[in-house]
From Swiss-Prot:
Species per Swiss-Prot/TrEMBL record: Carboxydothermus hydrogenoformans (strain ATCC BAA-161 / DSM 6008 / Z-2901)
BP-aspect Gene Ontology terms: tRNA methylation; tRNA wobble uridine modification
Name of the protein described by the UniProt record: tRNA modification GTPase MnmE
InterPro entries: G_TrmE, GTP-bd, GTP-bd_TrmE_N, GTPase_MnmE, MnmE_dom2, MnmE_helical, P-loop_NTPase, Small_GTP-bd
Database matches in CDD domains: trmE, TrmE_N
Family statement: Belongs to the TRAFAC class TrmE-Era-EngA-EngB-Septin-like GTPase superfamily. TrmE GTPase family.
Positions that bind GTP: 232-237, 251-257, 276-279, 363-365
NCBIfam families, per database record: mnmE_trmE_thdF, PRK05291.1-3, small_GTP
Gene: mnmE
Gene3D superfamilies documented for this protein: P-loop containing nucleotide triphosphate hydrolases, Probable tRNA modification gtpase trme, domain 1, tRNA modification GTPase MnmE domain 2
Residue positions binding Mg(2+): S236, T257
Length: 461
């Protein structure tokens, strides 16, 4: 339990119905009591936990009313932080909320650092580190699927799986320690064959977790899809079609889009940052030149490229130049303006000419082929469809890195057993794997790394 008490505004500043000032620590109730006058004569220090009280916040210096509020009291240890927590629900807006916070801080309360409320929940043992990280993922979730994944992690599902793997390692280590302490006895549990079988089982557990990372990463972080092509092939029209709204200006004049336009698309639960770029061509226009350079930068960073060509023109030298800038394996060829066709066209010849195997005939004018385009894009991102994220559990790069380190230690332990190394050397590798897995839940992690993780949070959380 922390000795000092902290406070911060927990809602975004700006006009709104409600603004919340959160106070946590041993002095939370007393601090609020000093500035809160309840409608009924109540002693805030004696009210039950999980109760809500109507009253007024008053400036003790002059007795003037600042705001009408609702005050909720949540006593330790059953609160968000595991400490006494008081939340003051006042009217939204900048001045009122900041004034309430100012009065609380004058009671000897410290302004909270970014993520400090959640950090206290972790340090007080209410949640583990993976659950704390899930809190920020919930805040940042852009789709229902990414929210669902973060919710599973917050509920402790990842912690349970990690702890189950750690317990298997501990069981092996226990038998190894016994065999080291009592070498005169023979134990069936620590024969090389049994140990190899048990370690293989643990290795498979870790690999299963690791195999879910790529899908989990996409759900958590989203992907960047860049629309590329020469001027006037329908890139902006494609953006508008995907978003189902007029986000970009569309004209028949080449070079209308001079800068990148970004927006977000929910593609079957995947957060997709869709980027409409300036058409790549040789130009003397300075502004358009800068837009073309920015397009090149985005193409280098793209997870997938939607390469748009005009079917009424075909593939020409300008298209070939752009093709040299993109990753064809992570691209979707959009053969646009099929509404202008008079006869049959062999669309596969476009795939052969461009070297992009994934293609879709499309009309940005009447949206023909839009659903097929979205399905193709999804297949490129998720080659093996696994549903809406049920099997994905690892989504954080930090978790992936520690799982890989643990896997390497387990493989080293397996190799040591197979080559007949002494069991105490095997124990070194197993203990290392145990530490790496513990770092995911925060059981074996230094203060500097913990502080860095919580610094990513906003103030008030």
């Amino acid at each position: 339990m922390m000795e000092d008490t902290i406070a911060a505004i927990s809602t975004p500043l700006g006009e709104g119905g409600i603004g919340i000032v959160r106070v946590s620590g041993p002095g939370a109730i007393e601090a609020v009591k000093n500035v809160f006058i309840p409608r009924q004569s109540k002693d805030l220090s004696k009210v039950p936990s999980f109760t809500l009280h109507y009253g007024k916040i008053v400036d003790p210096a002059d007795g003037k009313i600042v705001d009408e509020v609702l005050v909720s009291v949540m006593r330790a240890p059953k609160s968000y932080t595991g400490e006494d927590v008081v939340e003051i629900n006042c009217h939204g807006g900048i001045v009122a909320v900041e004034k309430v916070l100012e009065l609380i801080l004058k009671q000897g309360i410290r302004l909270a650092e970014p993520g400090e409320f959640t950090k206290r929940a972790f340090l007080n043992g209410r949640i583990d580190l993976s659950q704390a990280e899930a809190v920020i993922d919930i805040i940042r979730a852009k789709t229902e699927a990414s929210l669902k994944l973060a919710g599973r992690q917050l509920s402790g599902e990842l912690r349970e799986k990690i702890n189950a793997v750690r317990q298997k390692i501990i069981n092996i280590l226990a038998f190894i320690e016994v065999s080291i302490d009592y070498p005169e006895y023979e134990f069936d549990e620590v024969t090389p064959e049994t140990a190899l079988k048990n370690i293989d089982e643990i290795i498979n557990d870790v690999r299963r977790l690791l195999s879910s990372y790529e899908r989990g990463r996409i759900l958590r972080e989203g992907i960047t899809a860049v629309i590329a092509g020469k001027p006037n092939v329908g890139k902006s029209s494609l953006l508008n079609a995907l978003l189902r709204k007029k986000r970009a200006i569309v004209t028949d004049i080449p070079g209308t889009t001079r800068d990148v336009i970004e927006d977000y698309l929910n593609l079957k639960g995947i957060p997709v940052k869709i980027v409409d770029t300036a058409g790549i061509r040789e130009t003397e226009d300075l502004v358009e030149k800068l837009g073309v350079e920015k397009t090149r930068e985005y193409l280098n960073q793209a997870d997938v490229t939607l390469f748009v060509v005009d079917v009424s023109i075909g593939i020409d030298e300008d298209d070939e130049k752009i093709l040299s800038l993109i990753n064809k394996d992570k691209s979707l060829l959009v053969i646009n303006k099929i509404d202008l066709l008079q006869g049959k066209v062999n669309f596969e010849q476009y795939a052969v000419k461009t070297g992009i195997k994934n293609f879709v005939p499309f009309s940005a004018r009447n949206f023909e082929g839009l659903e097929i385009l979205e399905n193709k894009l999804y297949e490129i991102l998720i080659p093996e469809q696994e549903g809406e994220g049920e099997s994905a559990l690892i989504s954080n790069l930090r978790h992936k890195n520690y799982l890989e380190k643990a896997l390497n230690s387990l493989l080293s332990a397996k190799e040591s057993i197979a080559s007949g190394e002494p069991v105490d050397l095997v124990a070194i590798d197993l203990n290392e794997a145990l530490r790496e897995l513990g770092a995911i839940t925060g059981d074996a992690l230094g203060d500097e790394i913990i502080n860095e993780i919580f610094s990513q949070f906003c103030v008030g959380k």
